[in-house]
Amino acid sequence: VGQEEDFDAVREKALKCGAKDFILDDVRREFVEELIFPAIQANAIYEDVYLLGTSLARPVIARGMIETAEKMQCQFVSHGCTGKGNDQVRFELAFYGLNPDIKVIAPWRIPKFYQRFAGRSDLLEYAASKGIPVTQTKSKPWSTDENLFHISYEAGILEDPNTTPPADMWKLTQAPEKA
């Protein structure tokens, strides 16, 4: 969906983690034509500030996943969305709408998984112990969701509106006084 990403590194990481293959679909055109342009035309901005870039990207990602799953004759797809957020619903409704027979593996809803990994710290420790490269660190625990339309950040330290986000977090912007 147009994020800035080192896909060779993603491929290497996927294979190192046990994937049998890595398939990269370029869905930027579909994302722009089917979702971004109509959203701009409709002035689709949540609460007058949020561009909906994350939620807009999910249908085109889900469609690509289902098309690939069907081509590879897979019975299952998976996502890494937490069991608390809207993303799991966005993905799964799209999956089932496109292929009602598909089975979805959602690790964050599997008790054995979420009991083992209570949060980001546990995941970071596990990745480090297995030599799995990740961009987050304990000092920079936020995750990003980036696409052609926007970028969003998420982490516990960002949930408190009285806490100013770290200046080195921003990727597409910077403080006005530094512009």
Each predicted region: which residue ranges?
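Nucleotide-activated chemistry modules centered on ATP-dependent adenylation/adenylyltransferase
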Residues: 1-179
